Amino acid sequence: MAKLNIADIRQEYTKGGLRESELPGDPLSLFSRWLQEAIDAEVDEPTAVIVGTVSPKGRPSTRTVLLKGLHDGKFIFYTNYESRKGRQLAQNPSISLSFVWHAFERQIHIEGIATKVSPEESDEYFRKRPYKSRIGARISPQSQPIASRMQLIRSFVREAARWIGKEVERPDNWGGYAVTPTRIEFWQGRPNRLHDRFLYTLQPDGEWKISRLAP
């Protein structure tokens, strides 16, 4: 294996700063502003979020999904409940979410608890998905080994034939999670690695405590 010469790859962070005077009391309003700025700037996959879960033995795993909503202070995404993350969340609902927008030199890291959304909410979103995505959700044994890509394609074709002229129904093993945050950190790159980091921590009375963290 060739040696990767990456030790000297670096860049300065000069896109902006984050001041205490700019921080709202509610972190979700700052999250919404940063996300909207990423959307308006047409960055690639602005809603992409790295989801971290933990196995019963404490082994962490991550994957990238798409945020599909922010409702009543909760972050919403959808997945296969029988996937690796679904199985882990069934045993340990603790979860982390990380957003990275390189164009703005910004990151947001969230910790919280995941719960399933209602079947009705999952149905409503599923109906909005493209037809082929709905078929794909029905036939994919997500995270399980399969013999070949051809097997997947054949399953897709057979399933699509079953639903010609009919509304494709959401499978029971597919739906949404709502993440209730307990900690939200905002990271803004700054020159000389003196980055701005602010941590919001949810208090027992429902208020958020704000702390500046060392970079």
Residue ranges with predicted function:
Residues M1-P215:
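Binding-site signature for planar aromatic cofactors or substrates
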